[in-house]
Amino acid sequence: MPDFKIVISDPQSVEPKRIKVKVKANDQIKSIAGEKEGKAVPQAKVNEKTKQLLNIDTLITLEITKQEGDKKVKVKSHFKVEVDNNVPDNEVWISKTMAEKFGAEDFEAIAYRTKTLQISIDQDKATNLVGLKIGDTFEANQLIGLPVKLKITGGSDNSGFPMRFDVTGAAKRKILLSGPPGFYPNEDGERRRKTIRGNTISQEIVQINTIIVR
């Protein structure tokens, strides 16, 4: 079975400040099982000054551009932030496992407050979410190790059919739509009959979209 995906957006990270930082692999940062494959949120340490400079709440994104053959490729990862004032200004410490993803243990990167990230979890863990509806909230700490509350805003099933907030239940239905999700009209007033899922998470749902609520 495919992994269950949780897409997390931070509504307060609209135009995040971007700064150049020094990134170092540090033995103090322990690797977390699955962090390199996107199945866990890895840890990063910064000092309080850098955290305030970037207006970071919980998550930081590190991004580099590297040459691969004749192409330039962007590599980025998202991290859960922990404050440690032993870390120098404008420096970020990460695990050696995550440093491997960037191809170096000491490098420069662009850092900014995370806008969106995606985490994959095993389907058996996702059963804890079955029965929740669009608009419901849940604590993410136990599920993905992130100390935030998440609000469900949508999702899709294993065939790609989207959940609709205004359709009760979990069943697949074919209804007349005039707008998203499920249909994007080309003309004003255009309507089309489309297959969608109801607003309740079932075993057939493979992705949910969420926002951080405070």
From Swiss-Prot:
One of its GO terms (biological process) is translation. Coiled coil: none annotated. InterPro entries: Ribosomal_eS6, Ribosomal_eS6_arc, Ribosomal_eS6_CS. Transmembrane segments: none annotated. This is Small ribosomal subunit protein eS6. PANTHER family: 40S RIBOSOMAL PROTEIN S6. Belongs to the eukaryotic ribosomal protein eS6 family. GO terms for molecular function: structural constituent of ribosome. GO terms for cellular component: ribonucleoprotein complex; ribosome. The lineage of its organism: Archaea, Thermoproteota, Thermoprotei, Sulfolobales, Sulfolobaceae. Keywords: Ribonucleoprotein, Ribosomal protein.
